[in-house]
Amino acid sequence: MEWDLKMPPAASWELADELENSGGGGVPAAVSSSSAAVGGGVNAGGGGRQECSVDLKLGGLGEFGGGGAQPRVAVAGEPAKGKGPAAAATGAAAAASSAPAKRPRGAAAAGQQQCPSCAVDGCKEDLSKCRDYHRRHKVCEAHSKTPLVVVSGREMRFCQQCSRFHLLQEFDEAKRSCRKRLDGHNRRRRKPQPDPMNSASYLASQQGARFSPFATPRPEASWTGMIKTEESPYYTHHQIPLGISSRQQHFVGSTSDGGRRFPFLQEGEISFGTGAGAGGVPMDQAAAAAAASVCQPLLKTVAPPPPPHGGGGSGGGKMFSDGGLTQVLDSDCALSLLSAPANSTAIDVGGGRVVVQPTEHIPMAQPLISGLQFGGGGGSSAWFAARPHHQAATGAAATAVVVSTAGFSCPVVESEQLNTVLSSNDNEMNYNGMFHVGGEGSSDGTSSSLPFSWQ
């Protein structure tokens, strides 16, 4: 309901005159324009005059109240007093439209919010009392650890790392996490275990001249020897296959009246003829070349033994070989190791016997001496510069002090024959034993035992 508060001044005075004429003695208060702007009616007369409420909208007279009563001004939004039910309904609608809408609270709001339930078929567990983890992933605490559950008609299991249900094929037995997550987790956690057979602590590798618990495999190969003698201006080539992998790498020889034989590596027998009076056959150049070729790993420079005094045969000479020297061999004398084992290697040379330990566990290294020459008769033989010469006054063969780079030494001992030294350039091999010096055919039958040491 709207009020028209603006009235022209002429209409106000005309209305006051009409009321005054019809009132019969009492002049009602006139409504002025200023009072109309403030309220619906004003007090225009004295104390005895009546007040009127002017309805500006309808233009009719209001109800007259008692004397001294203050006029009541209608306020917008409030239903008029004394009006019908239509005015009251209109005021209530205006008040409802001006108030903001509010959301319902309390029990109604709790009923509208749905509580999550367990995703397992047939489970009616109330998750409102469970932890937030179980409410968020919609699984109860019991089914999160169950190895087999049915979800949407399929057999599944809850993965505690993925926080999801997976099929049973994605799990390992007795594992609560799926295989995909455990694969990367175990790879980061577990350290690789070293192979015990390939461990460096289990098998010591060979460093320099040290020994390993197992024999180092060496490849089988064939090498070509090049032999040149002083008498012949030509070189002779010999190719001998070496069966290194076999355990028959031993020197097995025998002494005969005709000469000294060296069957080496099962390649046949080679005779070194000395031209002795006991039926020895002189060794020709071809036999000497073949013998030196066979013994190429052992000798750097080998000279054929000269015939003794009074015996016919080939003269002394030198043979040069291009192979590496790992052992020294003197065919005029012999040394033997005491207490040699049964599987040791033996060489029978001219009445003496050399007993050598098996070489399959002793790696051969650098050459020991660069040259070796056989002398004849009672004269002194020319050896390498590292050892002094000693000549017996009685005309017997000279003995020598042999000094090698491996720290092997043998003092000067007078005997009837030159001594054979078999050594290895292994600086860290220690071996204590005795050398037996003297041949079987010595004149006095005495022998000397010499201590020696390999450092």
UniProtKB/Swiss-Prot annotation:
Annotated localization: Nucleus
Expression induction: Negatively regulated by microRNAs miR156b and miR156h.
One Pfam family, short name: SBP
Transmembrane segments: none
Binding residue positions for Zn(2+) 1: C118, C123, C140, H143
Expression across tissues: Expressed in young panicles.
Keyword entries, A-Z: DNA-binding, Metal-binding, Nucleus, Transcription, Transcription regulation, Zinc, Zinc-finger
Main location: nucleus
Disordered as annotated region, ranges: 182-204
InterPro entries the UniProt entry points to: SBP-like, SBP_dom, SBP_sf
GO molecular function: DNA binding; zinc ion binding
Positions with a binding annotation for Zn(2+) 2: C159, C162, H166, C178
GO cellular component, one term: nucleus
PANTHER family the UniProt entry points to: SQUAMOSA PROMOTER-BINDING-LIKE PROTEIN 16, SQUAMOSA PROMOTER-BINDING-LIKE PROTEIN 4
Domain notes: The SBP-type zinc finger is required for the binding to DNA.
Described purpose of this protein according to its UniProt entry: Trans-acting factor that binds specifically to the consensus nucleotide sequence 5'-TNCGTACAA-3'. May be involved in panicle development.
Protein name per UniProt: Squamosa promoter-binding-like protein 16
Originating species: Oryza sativa subsp. japonica
Lineage: Eukaryota, Viridiplantae, Streptophyta, Embryophyta, Tracheophyta
